Every structure is written in C-alpha cells, then in structure tokens.
C-alpha cells in the first residue's frame, strides 16, 4: 500500500517538471531503476538467506531506502502547480475514462501488467530444467537494455510509433513461443520479449497525461488501479496450463494482452 501511494504521487510530480514531449523518455529512465531492482532482487534475497537464514531482513532495508528517498525528495525544491480548491476523488478518476486516449492507455497499462506477470509465471515453466530461472533473469536484464535504449530513442521518435514497433515484435515472439521447444531459442525469445516490453508503461502513462495535463493526479490514480490487473495473470495462465498440460499454451493469454496493446497503439497513432 505504501509503495503504491509513492507511485501515485511521484509520476504526476515528474509531469510538472519535464517538457511534455520528453515525458515518455524521462518515465522510461525511472523504469531503468525499477527493472534493475527486479533483476537484483533474487540474488539479494538469496544472499540474505545464506547470511542470516531469513529473507525478512529485506524489509528493513527496503524501509530504509524508502525513507532516504523520501527525505531526499523533501529537501529538493520542486516548483509544483497551485493546488485546486477541491481534492480529486475516485469519481473524478473514472470520469476521465470518457477521454478515448485515457481509456485506451488505462486498459493498455492493465494489459501490460497482466502480460508482464504472465511472462514471469510462464518463463520458468517453458523449460523443464533447473536453470529455467535464468529465463526470468534474462527477461529483466533485457528489459534494462530496452529501457536504456528506449530513453534515448524516445527523444527522437514518437512514443506511440515506437510502441507500435515494439508490440508488433512482441506479438510475433509470443506466437513463436507457442511452438518453439529449443532451450536456446526460448531463452532468446523471452529476452527479446523483455526488450520489447521495456517502454510500454511509460508510453501509455505519458499519452494519458498529455491528453489531460490538468488532471495528472487523477491519471496517476487510474494507472495504479490498472496495475491490479496483474492479479488475474497467475490464475488464468495456471488454469490454461492445467487444462492442456502445456505451459507454452499459456502464452495465448500473453499474446491476447499484447494484441490489445498493439491495437491500442495503432488507435492512438491515428488519433494523434
């Protein structure tokens, strides 16, 4: 809950201090740190368990980093816009869904999180090998590379166009993973899929914020609510795997999410 509150607050704050045309690039830079954290989480937890016999020491470390970040932000002067007389409520957030760009982007974030969690769930099951955990590691490692390159590319290329390119490639990779059985090919496909998914959240968030810049706080609330879509991925992918006994068929769910994101990117490009 605390982490979610921080995410809701930080993204609109960023929107007030960066140029609108570069917002996607700046948000992507933030994703670099997030993806690096995800990549390092497993070795950190493993090291803590080996040293102390418990992973719970991770919690005070996380709390300490959060406090340090909060104090740093508190001591940094940030020119915020004047506050409105009335605070935004839940109804104000949902009212923004009447805007087509906001609706497409919110559903896009929901599909992105669902696909992201689905890939994490399936990637270790696509290879019947103790080293299959490396597929998840490779996925997040390639996500880091994707965010690094994306932060540079998005300064020069339209964010929606770049999203369309990536989702076209991602859909082809999802289709390939339905049939590929070679371990090296699976590692490569999952890694490149991670690269293609690197800038999705930043793009949808930036598009929605630029559509209604005066409602940046409400947009942030919608986007964070959309993250809850990740909760359905495990049960749905698990049900598919149990029903057919084939983890590769779970990629159908991921492919459906990616197909929506590709369609949404085309619609947003036409709107722009």
Predicted regions and their residues:
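Interfacial helix-cap and linker-helix signal at transmembrane-aqueous boundaries
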Residues: 44-53, 127-128, 153-154, 237-246
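Helix-loop-helix hairpin linking two adjacent transmembrane segments in secondary transporters
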Residues: 21, 26-77
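Juxtamembrane intracellular "pre-TM" segments in multi-pass secondary transporters
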Residues: 80-105
């Amino acid at each position: 809950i605390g982490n979610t509150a921080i995410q809701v607050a930080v993204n609109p704050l960023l929107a007030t201090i960066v140029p609108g045309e570069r917002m996607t690039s700046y948000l992507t830079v933030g994703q670099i740190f997030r993806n690096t954290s995800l990549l390092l989480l497993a070795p950190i937890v493993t090291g803590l368990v080996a040293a102390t016999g418990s992973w719970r020491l991770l919690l005070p470390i996380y709390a300490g980093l959060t406090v340090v970040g909060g104090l740093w932000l508190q001591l940094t002067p940030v020119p915020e816009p004047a506050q409105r007389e009335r605070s935004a409520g839940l109804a104000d957030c949902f009212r923004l869904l009447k805007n087509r760009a906001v609706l497409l982007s919110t559903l896009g974030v929901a599909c992105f999180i669902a696909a992201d969690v689905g890939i994490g769930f399936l990637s270790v099951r696509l290879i019947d090998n103790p080293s299959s955990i490396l597929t998840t590691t490779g996925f997040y490692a390639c996500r880091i590379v994707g965010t690094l390159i994306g932060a540079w590319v998005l300064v020069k290329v339209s964010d929606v166009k770049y999203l369309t390119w990536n989702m076209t490639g991602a859909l082809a990779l999802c289709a390939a993973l339905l049939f590929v059985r070679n371990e090296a090919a699976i590692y490569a496909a999952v890694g490149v899929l991670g690269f293609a998914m690197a800038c999705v959240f930043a793009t949808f968030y930036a598009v929605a914020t630029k559509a209604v810049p005066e409602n940046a706080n409400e947009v942030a609330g919608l986007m964070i609510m959309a993250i809850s879509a990740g909760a359905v991925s495990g049960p749905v992918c698990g049900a598919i795997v149990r029903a057919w006994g084939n983890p590769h068929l779970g990629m159908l769910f991921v492919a459906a999410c990616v197909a929506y994101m590709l369609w949404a990117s085309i619609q947003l490009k036409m709107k722009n």
